[in-house]
Regions:
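A short glycine-rich, Lys/Arg-flanked "PGG" loop and its adjoining helix->strand segment in the class I
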Residues: 146-161
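N-terminal auxiliary segments of SAM/dcSAM-dependent transferases
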Residues: 1-22
């Protein structure tokens, strides 16, 4: 299996401090969440997508929420700020988890967000289950989709809810692409969109809503590329 650090997006966890410095922040300064949110959302549409999750699965004050593959914990902080839920930001990469914890302290949200540096496949929550679980562009990194989907189901309360944004195979996928996807995207459990839904349903999830975001994300990426090229 390839190392996740081979994926360029994850090569430098501390780069976010350079972005914040460019906004005028010094190393010792407290941070405004809205400024941090410009850089700490490692998924399409930033906090708009996180707000959609809050509304879609009705995240409320005092809910116990787990974010799987939290990166810097951007969505976790936004959820905590907007709802006053208690959020566990679970992240495999130690450097991202440590930087995320520092950002949480600097935004004054440490009472609501707990950063956990652990592999999701090894993670256990013995005392309580979660009311809500969320994840953005992270699950496809984890091997053995059936195993971790079952784990997601078992970590939720009986009336708990799950919100996922993730990658699936596109219509142009060929088996020869697999090695490239593993190396460039650390893709360890990609499957077709329909199979993804089946995997969730087969472990016990009731699928209330789903949407193929391929065309939307393609448009988003093209527009972002144009901005970077200007």
């Amino acid at each position: 299996m390839n190392d996740i650090k081979e994926m360029k997006l994850y090569s430098n966890a501390h780069r976010i401090f350079n972005d914040l410095k460019a906004l005028g922040y010094a190393e010792e300064d407290e941070l405004k969440l809205e400024d941090v949110n410009q850089f700490d959302q490692l998924h399409y549409h930033g906090t708009l997508s996180v707000q959609e999750a809050i509304e879609s699965i009705n995240i409320q004050e005092n809910d116990n929420v787990l974010e799987v593959g939290a990166g810097w914990g951007g969505p976790s902080r936004y959820i905590a700020y907007k709802t006053r839920a208690n959020v566990s930001a679970l992240e495999l990469q130690q450097d991202y988890s440590e930087v995320g914890k520092e950002l949480t302290l600097k935004t004054g949200l440490e009472s609501f967000v707990t950063h956990i540096n652990e592999d999701f496949l090894n993670y256990s929550q013995k005392d309580t289950c979660f009311d809500k679980i969320v994840s953005w562009l992270a699950l496809y990194h984890i091997p053995n989709r059936k195993k971790y989907t079952e784990k997601l189901f078992n970590l939720l309360n009986k009336k708990g809810m799950l919100f996922i944004e993730d990658l699936t195979f596109g219509s142009g996928f060929e088996s020869s692409h697999k090695e490239m996807l593993e190396k460039k995207l650390f893709a360890n459990s990609l499957e077709k969109y329909s199979d993804y839904l089946d995997t969730c349903a087969n472990v016990g999830f009731e699928i209330v809503e789903h949407k193929d975001m391929s065309s939307d994300w393609e448009s988003f990426t093209k527009e972002r590329l144009k901005l970077l090229q200007t």
